[in-house]
Amino acid sequence: MKHKSLLTRVTLPLAVMALAVSMWGWALEGEQRTFVRYVPPSYNGTRPVPLVFEFHGYGSNALVQVFYGNFMSLADRYGFVIVAPNGQGSDRHFNLTGEAGLQDDVAMVGALLEHIEATMCVDQTRVFATGMSDGGAVASVLACRDPDRFAAFGAVAVVVYESGCADTSVPIMAFAGTADPVVPFNGGVVNCCGHPTLPGAPSAVAGWAQHDGCAATPVVDQLSTQVQRRTYAGCTGGGAVVFYVIQGGGHTWPGGLPVPSLGLTTRQINASSTIWSFFAAHPLA
């Protein structure tokens, strides 16, 4: 009976949240695209609220990511709306590299943002992007290509830096595990998804630090046995770069549901609450 009572207390909030999660579709250049939306109970349509875009990993989907990242409890507490687009293709991924036969997903996100802003009461100074794995790449690419409409970015398990980014300094936070079995921490061949080669997370974060005019060497804080924080100080133009290294961590969402096949999920930090605190501190100027 004790265990049953505990289970009820844990699952009831998720059941209530699920009632507020809805799937939507809209036509984009003749193609049907879909997204999941979560609206907190406090939303009344008259007071502008923050908007968090959340992107799923390769082969996953928006609904899974919304529950995996579990920003919903934070949305209830702080009053922001969550929008999670679905990828495309038979393997459900985001097209960031001009793949033939697929829509440009950076353009898709821009169109979806315009749609949400036209149909909801959104604070345009507090629009944010975060994601897991392939979704972390989406958030990173948006930071590079569309920094004037998004205020801050959070990338989990994959963070990338492209050459030729817009000059605008951006606040970006990244998480990566040193024992990631899918995307090597220090770079190399990815163990899925067509096996592309990616630079390591430390290299990508260093690229963002240079882009933002930050100090080349980060301030390192060992927060716990598994969590090291690297903060790049002195950034210019409102930029900020913070990197959480999960020592022994896998291809997982810190503080999220464990996925043993993808390695360690640390319980020593919660990526969602940490990312939201970072977002809340960095609205558009």
Language model segments and positions:
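Short beta-strand/loop motif that positions the catalytic acidic residue
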Residues: A174-A176, D180
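Short alpha-helix in the alpha/beta-hydrolase fold that links the catalytic acid
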Residues: F67-Y68, F185-N191, G200-Q210, S224-T231
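Bacterial N-terminal signal peptides that target proteins for export
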Residues: K2-P13
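A domain-start/cap signature at the N-terminus of enzymes
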Residues: A18-L51, R77, R126-G154, V158-V160, ...
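Active-site-adjacent mobile loop/cap segments within catalytic or ligand-binding domains
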Residues: F243-L257
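Acidic catalytic loop of the alpha/beta-hydrolase fold
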Residues: D180-V183, H251-T252
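Serine-hydrolase catalytic machinery in alpha/beta-hydrolase-like enzymes
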Residues: M23, A27-F128, M132, V138-V141, ...
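Short, proline-enriched alpha-helix->beta-strand connector loops that line the catalytic pocket
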Residues: D167-I172, G237-V241
